[in-house]
């Protein structure tokens, strides 16, 4: 699985974005999910605290592609768990750039995760 951090404003370096992508990707596991979920790409948004902790209640699905709504819900649940579990101690984000990453969009694609 792969995730892309979708909407982190320009001043963050490619390395900083990649660090967040890698951190979340380690926890993202669709496991033995349905075939439908395994072909579904979901875009997820999350609000972050200044210390790099995700605000769990803010995690929301913005949209999906490639599968059914049921498959998207399964993929979203896996994405939500990944953000919550790997973000338990905060993500490695530069505090001086908080205004740029306080709202993040991530694209979770079974073929690769990315930031947008």
At which residue positions do the language-model features occur?
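Intrinsic-disorder/low-complexity signature in envelope-associated proteins
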Residues: 1-29, 33-34
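Conserved "boundary/linchpin" sites in short secondary-structure elements
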Residues: 4, 22-29, 48-66, 80-116
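Short beta-strand
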Residues: 33-37, 97
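Short, small/polar residue-rich loop motifs at catalytic or cofactor-binding pockets
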Residues: 38-42
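Short, surface-exposed charged micro-motifs
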Residues: 45
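An anionic, turn-rich surface loop/hairpin at beta-sheet edges
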Residues: 67-73
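A short, basic-hydrophobic beta/loop patch
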Residues: 77
């Amino acid at each position: 699985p792969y995730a892309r951090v979708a909407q982190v404003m320009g001043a963050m370096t490619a390395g900083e974005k990649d660090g967040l992508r890698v951190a979340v990707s380690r926890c993202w596991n669709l496991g033995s999910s349905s075939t439908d979920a395994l072909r579904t790409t979901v875009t997820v948004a999350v609000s972050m605290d200044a210390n790099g902790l995700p605000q769990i209640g803010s995690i929301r699905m913005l949209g999906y592609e490639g599968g059914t709504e049921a498959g998207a819900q399964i993929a979203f649940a896996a994405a939500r768990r990944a953000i919550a579990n790997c973000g338990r101690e905060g993500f490695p984000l530069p505090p001086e750039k908080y205004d740029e990453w306080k709202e993040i969009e991530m694209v979770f694609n079974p073929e690769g995760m990315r930031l947008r």
